[in-house]
Amino acid sequence: MSELLLPPEHRYAKIIKERHNEDGSELSVLNLGPTHPATHGIFQNILLMDGERILEAEPTIGYIHRAFEKIAENRPFYQITPLTDRMNYCSSPINNMGWWMTLEKLLGIEVPKRAQYLRVIVMELARITDHIICNSILGVDTGAYTGFLYVFQFREKIYEIYEEICGARLTTNMGRIGGFERDWSPEAFRKLDKFLEEFPPAWKEFENLFERNRIFLDRTVNVGGITAEKAMAYGFTGPNLRAAGVDYDVRVAHPYSSYEDFDFIVPVGKSGDTYDRFCVRNAEVWESLSIIRQALEKMPEGNEYHAEVPDYYLPPKEDVYNSMESLIYHFKIVMGEVPVPVSEIYHAVEGGNGELGFYLSTDGSRTPYRLHFRRPCFIYYQAFPEMIKGALLSDAIIILSSLNVIAGELDA
Amino acid sequence: MSDSKVNMVSPPEGLTGEGFFATKLNDVVGLARANSLWPLPFATSCCGIEFMATMAAHYDLARFGSERVSFSPRQADMLLVMGTISKKMAPILRQVYEQMSEPRWVIAVGACASSGGVFDTYSVLQGIDKVIPVDVYVPGCPPRPEQIVDGVMRLQELVKSESVRRRSSPEYQELLASYNIS
Amino acid sequence: MALENTQIQNKLTETFNNDVFNFHEERDIFTLEASADKITALILFLKNDSELQFHFLTDLCGIHYPDNESERQFAVVYHLHNWFENKRIRIKVYLNGEKPEIKTISNIFLSSNWMERETYDFYGIDFIGHPQLKRILNMDEMVSFPMRKEFPMEDSGRTDKDDRFFGRTVSNC
């Protein structure tokens, strides 16, 4: 049986031949293949199993490798934003804003306070969408389909807010160097207020379905735990690390875009198991809602939404047609002939899954010399074989869902 | 009631009498197949999230007969390929398509599945029609749920008008042979 | 008490003398270069020292510089982070162009396992002592290293791209 699935020189084939159980049963190999209903995204795991228990796992990734880093070496800076969208596509505004902040650090541009607050609002909305998907799909994997249908309605509401701001639903390509491409319409603020009214009761209902639910607790408590030391050694960041007990959050450690003005706690779990990850994400949604409310209250007056950097920010069309300098700036920006210093920058933002870093090395030309994305999913997925050792097969599925591995970010 | 904008589906052409309705086999089979297409969601990347939005309550795809998504190829009618297919993934896509039983249809959702999309690189397959025959292409990056539903409706038109004998006809066998699918 | 750049520089030069050099503050991250054979000792020192405490490996990646001299054609960049003092540090190691190899740090930081595999996959840099150095993102059968500058981005097997529409003529491509 094992000859059909594995080449005989594979490590698992040798283990199966050598090991004999007392009751005469053999070990088996299961291919949790790239296309599987419960794995969200395509990654393969070859599992060595003893009945229903998993002894070892061998992951294979790269089934959606789109060579982002190679593409980025051939594109001017503005054209790299659509690439960043498609990494963690559940919360694409965070990726976009992270990229713009990296460029602003490179070019030494100071973004006005109001634009920073607007960025904070959009990033927290994106974090809410990411956690909505992760937690509701975790619910679907344990068999509770209703929660997914209820909260997905609110993802539609957030999509409507994105459409008011930038025109797109999922892959937003939002913002420009120095701020936003247009000011937010009053309709966007109205929809945001309506969302802030309607969402909290729905999220409370969603939480009540799961947090004290006997079946959910049986399936998730003490499943897939990881200690804090192990998590730090494996490079965990984000909600997965905070569930293990370490309160590292990039928004607090290296505040960016005025996060230091806001008052929020960083929820931390205890044992790092699936239930803790679920609860940490739930609590983070409440914190994000509180940050959005604070940002709306403290929003500075006026309507400036971008920095005054004519070298990098497209001038308004009326000026392009009527004034010579604007025409020249427009031409230079579109052609990519903008002054770029030679430098190396590393900037990190707190993405939905952890520390999303951008390492940019320029050489003065219109495209980056080297752009590397520090993708949190890629780094913490290494711990997955260790987390499922000794677990049942259905537990492995739950652990994978709760880690929130997004294939676009895994392979880039 | 009579001036409402609701489009009533009309029965196929045929002879009606007391207690019987005679029509062509093709029409009845086409009607039955078109309104019960079970999808196999082959979701790889961002278009998969828009598919989840299409299956959710707002843009319910289940109204069109796709109530039960089947992840087993043997039990699915249409293969919805959503997202970028890389060259590493192409043999697996091929295997899934070959395991599907006739009649089977393929919708390529999104720019990446139709033609490689924005990723013109060494590792991305430039369109799934390099490995499997495709019936409907839905462009967009990602396409809105309304567009995906439109793609499914176009497929329904195709299915309604398809002949029952098509799958054993020499043209179809030639099409499969051109993709090296036995 | 915050960790100052001068403090780091002094501690490192007194332990490693001439194997660490070119200390400078690149924008907001303190950067230094190191020589390839001392890298494991350097990283272990940075992790275990009670003052420096750079206990988290943020990132590991490679860069290709085909225009440099042959001893500095490839670079491996390590980003380390100290969460207690919120301090980041970047270490660059330049490698030979013909045979780029460097010792692995996967026994010091478990998270560097896949990052080194990715760097091998893209650049062909050999990590000596790595438990499983094979390709991770590309197909296993691939022979060339795609992120090197001489490798083309586009799929060379395409037949349906009409060069006229892309402005490609015999003279410019």
From Swiss-Prot, chain B:
Cellular component per GO, a single term: plasma membrane
Cofactor-binding details, from the entry: Binds 1 [4Fe-4S] cluster.
Subcellular location, principal: membrane
Residues that, per the record, bind [4Fe-4S] cluster: 46-47, 112, 141
UniProt record, GO biological process: aerobic respiration; electron transport coupled proton transport
SUPFAM superfamilies noted in UniProt: HydA/Nqo6-like (SSF56770)
Family affiliation: Belongs to the complex I 20 kDa subunit family.
GO molecular function: 4 iron, 4 sulfur cluster binding; iron ion binding; NADH dehydrogenase (ubiquinone) activity; NADH:ubiquinone reductase (non-electrogenic) activity; quinone binding
Record note on quaternary structure: NDH-1 is composed of 14 different subunits. Subunits NuoB, C, D, E, F, and G constitute the peripheral sector of the complex.
EC number, as in UniProt: 7.1.1.-
Name of the coding gene: nuoB
Cofactor field: [4Fe-4S] cluster
Keyword Nucleotide-binding: no
Enzyme class: translocase
Localisation: Cell inner membrane
NCBIfam families: nuoB_fam, PRK06411.1, PRK14820.1
InterPro entries, A to Z: NADH_UbQ_OxRdtase-like_20kDa, NADH_UQ_OxRdtase_20Kd_su
Protein purpose: NDH-1 shuttles electrons from NADH, via FMN and iron-sulfur (Fe-S) centers, to quinones in the respiratory chain. The immediate electron acceptor for the enzyme in this species is believed to be a menaquinone. Couples the redox reaction to proton translocation (for every two electrons transferred, four hydrogen ions are translocated across the cytoplasmic membrane), and thus conserves the redox energy in a proton gradient.
Official protein name in the record: NADH-quinone oxidoreductase subunit B
Organism of derivation: Flavobacterium johnsoniae (strain ATCC 17061 / DSM 2064 / JCM 8514 / BCRC 14874 / CCUG 350202 / NBRC 14942 / NCIMB 11054 / UW101)
